[in-house]
Amino acid sequence: MSKSEQLFEKAQKVIPGGVNSPVRAFKGVGGTPVFIQKAEGAYITDSDGKKYIDYVGSWGPMVLGHNHPAIIDAVLKAVPNGLSFGAPTESEITLAELVTKLVPSIELVRMVSSGTEATMSAIRLARGYTGRDKIIKFEGCYHGHSDSLLVKAGSGALTLGQPSGPGVPADFAKHTLTCTYNDLDSVKTAFEQYPNEIACLIVEPVAGNMNCIPPKNDFLKGLRALCDQYGAVFIIDEVMTGFRVALGGAQAYYDVKPDLTTLGKIIGGGMPVGAFGGKKEIMEYIAPTGPVYQAGTLSGNPIAMAAGLACLTELSKAGNEEKLAAQTKTLAEGFKALADKHNVPFTAQYVGGMFGLFFTEQAEITNFQEVMKCDAAKFNRFFHLMLEQGVYLAPSAFEAGFMSLAHSDEDIQATLVAADKAFAQL
């Protein structure tokens, strides 16, 4: 029995399912989850001492690679001054200034401790600001585990929200309308049906929780126009895409300006940080300047602020954005070429520093329905073949992969050598 197997057995006695976030349990791919002991650069090392080239990167935050010296140094300098104050600090101002500089649509920003907090708070703010209750989200898009956003999509162009499982009251979930990603007509239908009731529309600008699905054509600009037409707040959820698709986020890459933006992952440099921000007139509706309440004991935590500031400062250096995108392109197109070589039905999609692997006959995957038709069983086999060769991909056919600046050309080539062998066995 491996050390990971021993630890998983032990964990299940004191932690529900043995993990503190469901995807870590490997239920999507089968087998025992790998327990990590340490990480450095592009590599993670498990409890048995085996090293893996890591394309999960803690689900996105580790864009500089693990244990980056600039972040570690910033944290070590901040720690002696105290771990938490529950009071304002200069570091939260400095990070906020950098965020508003990098993302011009954000005029004011509020720090929180997670992406879920960010999206939950942004939706509450939009509801308070507009005086409306209903929200629009998209099938297959994930915005954290708050009640408003944990709803089952159902079929058809438009579905009144149904609870995705126990714990979400139907009377609450009914205010969530679910539309089809990359389908403006489904959104138009929602607005036409409830023209004066929709507080906001929230969207992942690149859907990263049904693998990696970029927006088609002018999908995002079409959403912007519909929100303007019907007086709804347009929220772009950049928890995953922020600073990764481009320094200014996916909104800069696709040239679209939201009313509110949610951030997470990279903004904390590996520490628990989230944020939401946007137009001054909307953000001033949040307490203490406005009537919509939001608070957090650890919001703006000084250690987390130091890590986030170091991460964004390093990431902002000339050439890093281009390097990240180029490395991602090399990897994704390399996967596709090898699949073609071995006659495996497959497509790879990528943008900026994120990518998705789909086992499908389709040349392009554009929404959740198409994702569900992909061969998840084949992905699971591919995942384990890669894992055996020391490559750690996302343990789910529905999650995006992440490149980091620490991945070298040699790391990518080693990954593709492993992929060549894996595709040959499918």
Swiss-Prot record:
Any one GO biological process: protoporphyrinogen IX biosynthetic process
Can you tell which superkingdom this protein's organism belongs to? Bacteria
Required cofactor names: pyridoxal 5'-phosphate
The top EC class, named as a word, is isomerase
Q: Which residues in this protein are found as N6-(pyridoxal phosphate)lysine?
A: 265
A Gene Ontology cellular-component term: cytoplasm
* Documented EC number(s): 5.4.3.8
Q: Which reaction does it catalyse?
A: (S)-4-amino-5-oxopentanoate = 5-aminolevulinate
The UniProt entry, under InterPro entries, shows: 4pyrrol_synth_GluAld_NH2Trfase (IPR004639), Aminotrans_3 (IPR005814), Aminotrans_3_PPA_site (IPR049704), PyrdxlP-dep_Trfase (IPR015424), PyrdxlP-dep_Trfase_major (IPR015421), PyrdxlP-dep_Trfase_small (IPR015422)
The entry's keywords = Cytoplasm, Isomerase, Porphyrin biosynthesis, Pyridoxal phosphate
Which compartments does it reside in?
A: Cytoplasm
Q: In which pathway does it act?
A: Porphyrin-containing compound metabolism; protoporphyrin-IX biosynthesis; 5-aminolevulinate from L-glutamyl-tRNA(Glu): step 2/2
**GO molecular function of the protein, one example?**
transaminase activity
Family named by the database record:
Belongs to the class-III pyridoxal-phosphate-dependent aminotransferase family. HemL subfamily.
What PANTHER family does this protein map onto?
Answer: GLUTAMATE-1-SEMIALDEHYDE 2,1-AMINOMUTASE, GLUTAMATE-1-SEMIALDEHYDE 2,1-AMINOMUTASE 1, CHLOROPLASTIC-RELATED
Q: How does it assemble?
A: Homodimer.
HAMAP family recorded:
HemL_aminotrans_3 (MF_00375)
Protein name in the entry: Glutamate-1-semialdehyde 2,1-aminomutase
